[in-house]
């Protein structure tokens, strides 16, 4: 075991997979000489050379399109988009081509590639460096979507994504890149895509989150415990496919659920989970599902931490559910 930040865990995952499998290549803006804008790919160019670690032009369309071509010819590319906000110029390649290759070829071709994206706010990045666009990806059939919150999960799930036969959008909470450290196995391991993590057991209320907001979710659960409320905490980790069984089992047990995300509220991913809970567990709910999200505005430069779900907002939502 070694104490790692998320950046270090991601770097270790890439290094190990490149050493293990010569088909794994990395491409993106500044991923080579610079080591990536957040230094996730630091040292890989020196170790594996420019044929496997490729600096690209500033063109998301070209990055995703090139990754698809590489995947179709037998490589396993890991493409980096510097910020999730910048993926939109690459949407034609990602949505129209990458996501649909297996389906439109009748399974003759697959697209085993990963598109890594630093996502979310809390770093005073403003409206072009703070968005959480996961709803676009989960709505696109053919993509798997991962959203990690810990170094342990980051390493295990990135390795699983690289080995997956289908395209994976890998969302990394930039706010947690260096603010969280934990012990991470130095040996090889993977985690299952599609499986949530039970972070805390409880019986009175379920709190569900992923990615950027998980520190606030866990802190809210700790505050509720001081007040005698036993909150169960689920970290989804994967948004497509999301862990239906874990969510339903937890909410059926507690009868109350608060869903937390830093994405805008309208048509958010947690809205889909809330709707599914309401449809399938209506007769077991003691209160309606409650969402705590970002706001339906562009992400602000000033006071960006007030845009994020706060512990106070989560506690207020929990109180509404408990008092219903």
From Swiss-Prot:
It is an enzyme of class 1 (oxidoreductase). Its cofactor is thiamine diphosphate. It catalyses: N(6)-[(R)-lipoyl]-L-lysyl-[protein] + 3-methyl-2-oxobutanoate + H(+) = N(6)-[(R)-S(8)-2-methylpropanoyldihydrolipoyl]-L-lysyl-[protein] + CO2. Substrate binds at residues 83-86, 129. Keywords: Oxidoreductase, Thiamine pyrophosphate. The active site is at 129 (proton acceptor). Gene3D superfamilies: 3.40.50.920, 3.40.50.970. GO terms for molecular function: 3-methyl-2-oxobutanoate dehydrogenase (2-methylpropanoyl-transferring) activity. Thiamine diphosphate binds at residues 29, 58-60, 82, 86-89. It comes from the Bacteria. It holds the Pfam family Transketolase_C. The branched-chain alpha-keto dehydrogenase complex catalyzes the overall conversion of alpha-keto acids to acyl-CoA and CO(2). It contains multiple copies of three enzymatic components: branched-chain alpha-keto acid decarboxylase (E1), lipoamide acyltransferase (E2) and lipoamide dehydrogenase (E3). Heterotetramer of two alpha and two beta chains. Directly associated with ODBA in the E1 complex. This is 2-oxoisovalerate dehydrogenase subunit beta. The lineage of its organism: Bacteria, Thermotogati, Deinococcota, Deinococci, Thermales.
């Amino acid at each position: 075991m070694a104490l790692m930040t998320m950046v270090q865990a991601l770097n270790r995952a890439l290094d190990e997979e490149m050493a293990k499998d010569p088909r794994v290549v990395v491409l993106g803006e500044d991923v080579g000489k610079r080591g990536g804008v957040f230094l996730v790919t630091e040292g890989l160019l020196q170790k594996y050379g420019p044929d496997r670690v490729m600096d690209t032009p500033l063109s998301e369309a070209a990055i995703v399109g090139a990754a698809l071509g590489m995947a179709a010819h037998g490589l396993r590319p890991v493409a980096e988009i510097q910020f999730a906000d910048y993926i939109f110029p690459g949407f034609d390649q990602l949505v129209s081509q990458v996501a649909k290759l297996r389906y439109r070829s009748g399974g003759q071709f697959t697209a085993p590639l990963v598109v890594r994206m630093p996502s979310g706010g809390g770093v005073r990045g403003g409206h072009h460096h703070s968005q959480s666009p996961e709803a676009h990806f989960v709505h696109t059939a053919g993509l798997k979507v991962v959203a990690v919150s810990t170094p342990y999960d980051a390493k295990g799930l990135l390795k699983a994504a690289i080995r997956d036969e289908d395209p994976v959008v890998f969302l990394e909470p930039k706010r947690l890149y260096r603010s969280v450290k934990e012990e991470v196995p130095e040996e090889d391991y993977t985690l299952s895509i599609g499986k949530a993590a039970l972070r805390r057991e409880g019986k009175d209320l379920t709190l569900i989150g992923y990615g950027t907001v998980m520190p606030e979710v866990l802190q809210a659960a700790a505050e509720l415990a001081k007040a005698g409320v036993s909150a169960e905490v689920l970290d989804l980790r994967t948004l497509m496919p999301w862990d239906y069984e874990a969510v339903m089992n937890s909410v059926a047990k507690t009868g109350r659920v608060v869903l937390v995300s830093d994405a805008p509220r309208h048509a958010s991913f947690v809205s889909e989970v809330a709707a599914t809970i309401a449809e399938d567990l209506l007769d077991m709910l003691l209160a309606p599902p409650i969402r705590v999200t970002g706001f339906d505005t562009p992400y602000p430069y000033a006071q960006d931490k007030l845009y994020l779900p706060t512990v106070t907002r989560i506690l207020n939502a929990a109180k509404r559910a408990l008092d219903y």
